[in-house]
């Protein structure tokens, strides 16, 4: 992962905006922050440099005692999402600081976005890997089967990494070099060019570059 500061956000959905000469630009609307610094980790105390942030407030009645003690250090009730950003110099941040979208990004910036792809469940090789499949008719009984998965006497086994049916999606995906189309400070919204990983209301980590 990039060793830069970033912000947490929620994937609201997609829409389009229009550029200066009228071109339609597909964008993903992300509710980005505000995030609160919960902990600052350093090489001396934790073995690595990082800034831990919380996003989306949670009622104190929904927080267990261990979480409540941790959140109390930053004078917070609670957060639904707690994540870390690896940074080179954590000394620039203090516990309790608020991180807003306009402090990190502006229109035209290039960022990296991390999310969790949509889970598709157990899928076959055609949907999962794009296999061509077998013959469509004429007595064929393996329209969507993978076909042979190995060799004969040598090596006499299925090789590691063979593409086969299995669980598809629900993976961590990092999309690099995404353009920030617009930042709307009053709404804590950032518009990112193109689609982002994951479903609506999914959590996104946006890294500055």
Swiss-Prot record:
Give the family from UniProt: Belongs to the universal ribosomal protein uL3 family.
PROSITE patterns xref list: RIBOSOMAL_L3 (PS00474)
PANTHER family, from UniProt? 50S RIBOSOMAL PROTEIN L3 (PTHR11229), LARGE RIBOSOMAL SUBUNIT PROTEIN UL3C (PTHR11229:SF16)
What terms describe the molecular function in GO for this protein? rRNA binding; structural constituent of ribosome
Cited SUPFAM superfamilies:
Translation proteins (SSF50447)
Sorted keywords for this record are:
Ribonucleoprotein, Ribosomal protein, RNA-binding, rRNA-binding
Q: Which stretch is the leader sequence?
A: none
- GO BP terms: translation
Quaternary structure annotation from Swiss-Prot or TrEMBL: Part of the 50S ribosomal subunit. Forms a cluster with proteins L14 and L19.
Instruction: Please state what the protein is called.
Output: Large ribosomal subunit protein uL3
Gene Ontology cellular component? Answer: cytosolic large ribosomal subunit
Species for this entry = Desulfotalea psychrophila (strain LSv54 / DSM 12343)
Describe the task this protein carries out.
Answer: One of the primary rRNA binding proteins, it binds directly near the 3'-end of the 23S rRNA, where it nucleates assembly of the 50S subunit.
Q: Report the Pfam families cross-referenced here.
A: Ribosomal_L3
